[in-house]
């Protein structure tokens, strides 16, 4: 296996050689709250990365990846962030569904879907959240029923799943071809029991996708309605009724080594905010200076924690990481608004536009991917061994 520093140098040089021409215009585009930016152009960039063998780095070689270590992947994400390269468009496929299929999927599912994730020809979205469930992921009301003739031919015959229900806050659904959906497949089941993890094609009459207008004026999220939508009987990952275990497995992949690359981007945002404070005169305010110093200290603490735990698997470490970066980024957004002063009250304001968008989207940082309250409950109950929260 290539040495980490040699691989880091390879990535740095490749990015310098390739993030040029039309691709240079994509620098800094995409990411949370900005997924709509130059989407098709970023897809082309993502395919360019794939052709160079710079996607799916941690996947096993037999599944098309490079089988690289956590340290190699950290090096990639750090160099990628330092180059200000555009956010990838196939996050859900490369970092969530792909590893899930490798861990829980059948050989047939792996053969069918992994190559198209690798070459970025099929995009995926995540069908977890529901409108009446809040942060309670187990409160699933979307249903799926297996119908058809099981005896017609083969193990599942002519059977297929019929899906009804609604998912919400579904990022990238209006660009994706497929959605991995958690649905209730056992009538009368409650909570974690009776759930299944289904792979559902979105281009069919039984699926309606409605973009949600955000505070920023963009539409990155969607509502997805399933009205007798169908998917093949064999497109359940794991066993029917075992969907909770598979879904939790997917979530363990969600908060991975990309966090260190994310922190490089945060460091750039912090540096840019310091420069803005100097230009506007806000840096003359001792309270602003103190908050900027505290923010920088928090960023270093996050990085130290991520480096110390990247090779360690223990309960709660991902939850602590999520709490750290979500709170840090929300506070940075608040500092940015104060640095702008009265100019921060209007959205279309040239130089300040990016900071207002950062502030608006950072309000969601402590909610999506598991709210702060959920993270604290998990840490308290599963790590510290405290009594479970009393339900009202």
From Swiss-Prot:
One of its GO terms (biological process) is cholesterol catabolic process. InterPro entries: Acyl-CoA_Oxase/DH_mid-dom, Acyl-CoA_Oxase/DH_mid-dom_sf, AcylCo_DH-like_C, AcylCo_DH/oxidase_C, AcylCoA_DH/ox_N, AcylCoA_DH/ox_N_sf, AcylCoA_DH/oxidase_NM_dom_sf, Mycobact_Acyl-CoA_DH. GO terms for molecular function: flavin adenine dinucleotide binding; oxidoreductase activity, acting on the CH-CH group of donors. It catalyses: 3-[(3aS,4S,5R,7aS)-5-hydroxy-7a-methyl-1-oxo-octahydro-1H-inden-4-yl]propanoyl-CoA + A = (2E)-3-[(3aS,4S,5R,7aS)-5-hydroxy-7a-methyl-1-oxo-octahydro-1H-inden-4-yl]prop-2-enoyl-CoA + AH2. Pathway: Steroid metabolism; cholesterol degradation. Disruption phenotype: Deletion mutant grows normally on glycerol but shows impaired growth on cholesterol. It accumulates 5OH-HIP in the culture supernatant. Pfam families: Acyl-CoA_dh_1, Acyl-CoA_dh_M, Acyl-CoA_dh_N. It comes from the Bacteria. The active site is at 254 (proton acceptor). GO terms for cellular component: plasma membrane. Keywords: Cholesterol metabolism, FAD, Flavoprotein, Lipid metabolism, Oxidoreductase, Steroid metabolism, Sterol metabolism. Binds 2 FAD per heterotetramer. SUPFAM superfamilies: Acyl-CoA dehydrogenase C-terminal domain-like, Acyl-CoA dehydrogenase NM domain-like. FAD binds at residues 126-129, 171, 371-373. Its EC number is 1.3.99.-. Signal peptide: none annotated. Its cofactor is FAD. Heterotetramer composed of 2 IpdE1 subunits and 2 IpdE2 subunits. Belongs to the acyl-CoA dehydrogenase family. Involved in cholesterol degradation. Catalyzes the dehydrogenation of 5OH-HIP-CoA to 5OH-HIPE-CoA. This is Acyl-CoA dehydrogenase IpdE1. It comes from Mycolicibacterium smegmatis (strain ATCC 700084 / mc(2)155).
């Amino acid at each position: 296996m290539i040495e980490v520093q040699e691989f880091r140098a390879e990535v740095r040089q490749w990015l310098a050689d390739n993030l040029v021409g039309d691709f240079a215009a994509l620098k800094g585009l995409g990411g949370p709250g900005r997924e709509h930016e130059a989407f098709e152009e970023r897809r082309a960039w993502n395919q360019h990365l794939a052709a160079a063998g710079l996607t799916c780095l941690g996947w096993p070689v037999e599944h098309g990846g490079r089988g690289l270590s956590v340290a190699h992947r950290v090096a990639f994400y750090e160099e990628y962030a330092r180059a200000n390269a555009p956010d990838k468009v196939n996050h859900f496929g490369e970092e969530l569904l792909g590893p899930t299929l490798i861990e829980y999927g059948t050989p047939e599912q792996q053969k069918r879907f992994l190559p198209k994730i690798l070459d970025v020809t099929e995009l995926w979205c995540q069908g977890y959240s529901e409108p009446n469930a809040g942060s309670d992921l187990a409160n699933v009301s979307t249903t799926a029923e297996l119908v058809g003739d099981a005896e017609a031919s083969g193990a599942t015959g002519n059977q297929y799943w019929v899906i009804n229900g609604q998912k919400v806050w579904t990022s990238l659904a209006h660009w994706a071809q497929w959605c991995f959906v958690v649905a209730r497949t056992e009538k009368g089941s409650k909570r974690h029991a009776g759930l299944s993890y289904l792979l559902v094609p979105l281009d069919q009459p039984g699926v309606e996708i409605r973009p949600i207008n955000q505070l920023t004026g963009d539409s990155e999220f969607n509502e997805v309605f399933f009205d007798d939508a169908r998917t093949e009987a064999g497109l359940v990952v794991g066993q029917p009724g075992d969907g909770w275990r598979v879904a939790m497995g997917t979530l363990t992949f969600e908060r991975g080594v990309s966090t260190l690359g994310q922190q490089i981007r945060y460091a750039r945002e912090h540096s840019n905010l310091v420069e803005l404070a100097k230009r506007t005169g806000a840096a003359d305010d001792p309270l602003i200076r103190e908050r900027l110093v505290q923010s920088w200290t928090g960023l270093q603490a996050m990085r130290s924690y991520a480096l110390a735990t990247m090779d360690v698997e223990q309960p709660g470490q991902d939850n602590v990481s999520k709490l750290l970066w979500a709170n840090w980024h929300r506070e940075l957004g608040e500092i940015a608004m104060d640095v702008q002063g009265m100019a921060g009250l209007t959205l279309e304001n040239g130089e300040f536009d990016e900071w207002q968008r950062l502030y608006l989207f950072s309000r969601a940082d402590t909610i999506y991917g598991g709210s702060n309250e959920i993270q604290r409950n998990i840490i308290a109950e599963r790590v510290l061994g405290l009594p479970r929260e009393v339900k009202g």
